Structures are given as C-alpha cells and as structure tokens.
Amino acid sequence: MYRVSKVLNNNGVIAIDMDENKEYVILGKGVGFGKKVSQRFDKPEGCTTYRLEQETERGSAKELVKGIEPEYLEIADAILTESQKVFGDSIDRGILFPLADHISFAVARIRRNEQISNPLTEDIKVLFYSEFKVAETLKTILRERLQIESDDHEVGYVALHIHSAIGDEKVSVAMQTARAVRECIDMIEKATGKPIDVLSLSYNRLMNHMKYMVARASTGEKLNLDMNEYMLDQYPQAYKVATDICKNLE
C-alpha cells in the first residue's frame, strides 16, 4: 500500500511505501489521474517504481527530481523500458533521475537552437553498439511527444547512460574509455599517415580490442599471452606504434 505525497501528472506520483516507509516515484499510464495528496492506493499493474532515497552520479535522487519536469521522467522511463527489452534485468533503472536530468537539459539546448558536438559520437556507436541502438529511441520519443528533432550526438550521450546502467559504471568512466580509445586511434592514424575507414570491419575489430585493452589497463589486469618477440620480428612498425600506445595509456 502506498500513500501519495505529491502528484506529478496524470502518469506519475511520488508516494510513500507504507510498509517500508520509503519514498518512491511511481510512473505508469493514469497512475496519477484523480489522485490527491495523502490518498492511499495499491500500485496498478504495469507501473514502474524508482526509489528516491539513493545517490546518483549527479547527486541525491530526491534533490534531482525537484528540478525535473515529469515529462522527462516519463521519457527516461520509456528509454529504460526499451533497454530492459534488450538487456533484461541487468539494467539498473536507478539511472532514471540522471538520465531524465540529462534529457531535460538536452531538450532545452535543442529548443534554443544550440548545437552540441560530441567528437566521440562515432566511437561510441562502435564501442557501445547495442546501447546506441537502444538510445536511438530518443529521436522517436522526442519527435512524437515534444515535436522536436535530436541528433546522433545527443543519442551518444544517452547511450553512455544506458551503458552505465548495464555495467554499474559511471557515465564519466564510459566517456573516459571512449576518449582513451579515440586517442589510441589518433596515434595509429598519425603513425601510419592514413585515416582508418570507420565503416570497415577492421575498424570495428580494432575499436573493440582497444576498448578491452583500456578496461584491462584501468584495472591492472594482465594478459597471459607472450607474442612480443614474434610481433617485433614480423611487424616492427606496428609493434612500435602499439608500444607507444601502451606507454601513452600509462
């Protein structure tokens, strides 16, 4: 049994679980319709609950929700629902609040005709492919609900939030990984004097190798694979570039 502490809109309320004495955001079609403060109710079928007593990367959920319009909570909830269809119960829906906060700022930027450029967008597409595909639902949702158009740069940022929800990894860490991989790619292109075709299979393979290399470097994990002498003998230029990349990561 819940008790309403605040009605957000027809599709959302903030309510206290009377058994746990903890506060939640409850989202679902019609869950707030006709509700009054202090009214008691059972959670309807198909609703999602989000605990307010938690800390997020952007601060307290309880403080965050005060500055977020309910429609952005609904949009974030819809994206997380799509994420759960792909990634199952491994998705941490607790990222609702920072995700909704990000979407709120993104919409404000779009409405002011402020274009943001994320230099890592193409890398994020490859590094976090599945997350990016789910995040693309942002475009459809914003078009249908708010009649505004978003681009791949905004989708890329949402993809990082989804990745954070899957791997219990901060968005800033995912961004750091993408940035480190981009630096490695830049070093390869500079050393070879040739750009890498981002649409090629080789690029996809290289990006994924780089991603796991960066992840291992950040945790101190070492590979039990000794091919150094062979690679130095057979591919000296490639070996030198790889050595420089590893030194740069340190």
Predicted regions span which residues?
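A cross-family "folded-core" feature that marks the main globular domain of proteins
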Residues: 1-250
